[in-house]
Amino acid sequence: MKKLTDKQKSRLWELQRNRNFQASRRLEGVEMPLVTLTAAEALARLEELRSHYER
């Protein structure tokens, strides 16, 4: 079995953290859709929101 690269480890950790957060919120009775953005997509979305709100 090949070892994971640092980038793969980081992505795997992010996905696991997101799943754990979602499970924790469900236990508290809060249901929300799973967010599956890549880092690049998230940064693009942040820029879009900043340009909208920083007038």
Swiss-Prot record:
This is Uncharacterized protein YhfG. It comes from Escherichia coli (strain K12). Pfam families: YhfG (PF10832).
